[in-house]
Amino acid sequence: KSASIGVAAAGPSGRILVMVETHPGTAWVVPRLVKILAKREVLEVSLHPGSQASVLISDLVAESVEFVPLSTRAMGQACADFITWVNEKKRIAHVGQIELDAAVANAKTRFSSEAELWDRRDRNIDISPLVAASGAAHRWALLEDYDVMDSIG
């Protein structure tokens, strides 16, 4: 029913700041990403091709927007990270967006093999803001911890 773009950045006190933009449908997503990419320094665009986000791939390719495909395993890591960062480590900061607050309040998880994932099967509850925010925070943390010198022999 709706789609969300999640962004993550360095937040206050070493926390990860997450923000989302959510609108009905998916037609708006790629044009909005193109505008964001033109105006901001974006480290990466990522999506889970095993989800409804797969409908965006052809438009992303047509607009020459490079993206990182996230596996179900990576989405499980993002879910686990976000739960831990919110509940235990207090590592997430956000600006109090209604869509994200509602998604967090109503979200449930499920297991696929041994991975805990956000349960998106209930169409009456839109958790796309939470899925987008957790994916963005997970990828930000990985990129934040990456040292380019580690890849030089």
Q: Can you name each region flagged by the protein language model?
A:
Residues K1-T72, G76, A80, T84, ...:
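RNase H-like, metal-dependent nuclease domains and their acidic two-metal-ion catalytic environment used
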